[in-house]
Regions:
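Short acidic/polar N-terminal linker immediately downstream of export determinants
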Residues: 1-31, 40-60, 75-77
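Extended, compositionally simple hydrophobic/Ser/Thr-rich segments
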Residues: 2-13, 57-59, 63-174
C-alpha cells in the first residue's frame, strides 16, 4: 500500500494487523482535511491552503511500499516496520523518521530541503538527493549502499559490503 501527503501534515505510522486512519485538527478545520483511497494509495491533503492549523494523522497499517510527502509534511514511524521494499519520496521541506526491523530494499528520493533519519536494517539502500537535503542513515545497517547527491545535500551512510557514491556541487557523503 501507498501513502501520499500534501501540505503541512504530521503523520504517525504504526505497523499493526488492523488498518486505521485518525485525523486530528481544529474542529472547524476538520471538513477541509481530506483522506481518500485512489488506486490503492491513501491520499491526505487539505482543501484550504490559507489556514494552517496543525493536522495530525495517525495511520495503522500492516504493509507499506511507498510514502510520498510534498510541502512540509512530517512522517514518523512509531514502531519498527518489517517490510520487503520501501520507497520514500520527499519534496519541499518534508521530513521522515524511518524505523525498520527489516527490509530487503529501501529507496530515498529527496528534492528540496527534505530531511530523513533512518535506523534499523535494510539490505540494499538507494539514495538520490537534490537541493539541500539531509540524510542520516548511520544507524541503518545496510549491506549495499548506492547514493547520488546534487546541490548542497549531505548524507551519512553505512555499508558493510558495497558502496557506490557520487556527490556533485557542494554535496557531501560521509
Amino acid at each position: 500500500s501507498s501513502i501520499e501527503a500534501s501540505g503541512a501534515i504530521e503523520i504517525d505510522l504504526t505497523q499493526q494487523p488492523n488498518q486505521s486512519v485518525t485525523v486530528n485538527t481544529l474542529r472547524e478545520y476538520l471538513p477541509n482535511v481530506k483522506t481518500e483511497v485512489v488506486d490503492g494509495k491513501l491520499k491526505i491533503y487539505s482543501t484550504d491552503n490559507l489556514i494552517k492549523p496543525v493536522i495530525k494523522v495517525q495511520i495503522g497499517i500492516d504493509s507499506l511500499s511507498t510514502i510520498e510527502a510534498r510541502g512540509a509534511s512530517d512522517i514518523d514511524f512509531k514502531n519498527s516496520f518489517a517490510l520487503k521494499d520501501l520507497n520514500i519520496i520527499l519534496r519541499g521541506t518534508s521530513k521522515a523518521d524511518i524505523k525498520l526491523s527489516s527490509a530487503q530494499k529501501l529507496e530515498f528520493d529527496i528534492q528540496g530541503a527534505g530531511k530523513i533519519h533512518a535506523s534499523g536494517v535494510a539490505d540494499t539502500l538507494n539514495i538520490r538527493g537534490d537541493g539541500a537535503s539531509k540524510i542520516d542513515t548511520e544507524k541503518l545497517g545496510s549491506k549495499v549502499v548506492r547514493i547520488e547527491l546534487n546541490g548542497a545535500s549531505h548524507a551519512e551512510v553505512f555499508a558493510s559490503e558495497s558502496f557506490d557514491g557520487h556527490a556533485f556541487g557542494v554535496s557531501k557523503i560521509s
